[in-house]
C-alpha cells in the first residue's frame, strides 16, 4: 500500500468519525434551538390503552423546556379534550389541544360524540379524526373486525356530512384518519365545497397516497401531514396493527415529495410516544437533520413545523425563517 493510499484511507476514516460525532452531538446535546417554536399536531402519551413512553404531563413539561410551542394530544380510543384542559392548567405557556377519533370506541361516525366533546369546558377539542385503526383501510390488513365506513359507493355517508357540519359550527379541524386515499379525496373535496377552513390529511404516505393525489388534496385547501416515522431508522416503528405494512422512505424521496407538493401545503409532525419509537426530543432532531441532509432549507422546515400548524390550529404564526 502506498503512502498516498494510506493517507486517503486515514482521511476517509477521520471524516466518517467527525460526521458521526457531529450527529451524536446534535441528537444528544442540551440545545433547544432545533425544537424552538414547533407545534406537534400528532403527539401520543399516557393515559392511553396502548403502551406509551411518557404521560401527557411529562411530555408537556419537557416539550416546553425544549422551546416547543404546543401539541395536539392524540389517542386512537379516548377523547382528549379533558386531558388538554388539565395540561393547559398545569403547564402554562405550552398550548395543548384535544382530539376525538371516530373509531368504534366512541360509536364510529357519531355526530353526538363530536358535539359533546366540543362543549367540554375550555373548548380544547380541536382535531376530529375520521376512523384510524377501525378504518376499512386498516382492517384490510389487520385482524378482521367490523370497520367504520365514511362513504358508500363513492359518496360520503349522511353521518359523515353531519360531522363535517359540526366541524364548521364549532370551528374544529377535520383530520382524515387512516381512511383509504379515495375516501381522503372525497373528504377534502367535500370540505372545500362546504367551506371547512382547516383540514389535514393524516400521514398520507402511510396510506400509500400518490403524489398526484396529495397535490389534488392540497388544491382542495388541505394540509398534508408528514410524520417522522417513514424516515426514522428501521426497527423504531409502531404497532403494525395501527398502520399496516408501514412503508419506509429515504429522506431524498421525502424531500422530492415536499418539492412536488410545496412546503406551504405540508405539516411536519412527530407521531412519537410509542415504545418502539425514539423519544420525541432526539426523534424530532433526527427528523430535521434527515430533511436538511436531503436539501430542505431551514426556512422550509420552520414553515412546515411552526407556521403551518399554527395556521391550521387558528393561532398567530410566528415569524418565518428563524
Regions found by a protein language model. Name each.
Residues 44-46, 76, 99-105, 131-135, ...:
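Active-site beta-loop-alpha junctions enriched in small/polar residues
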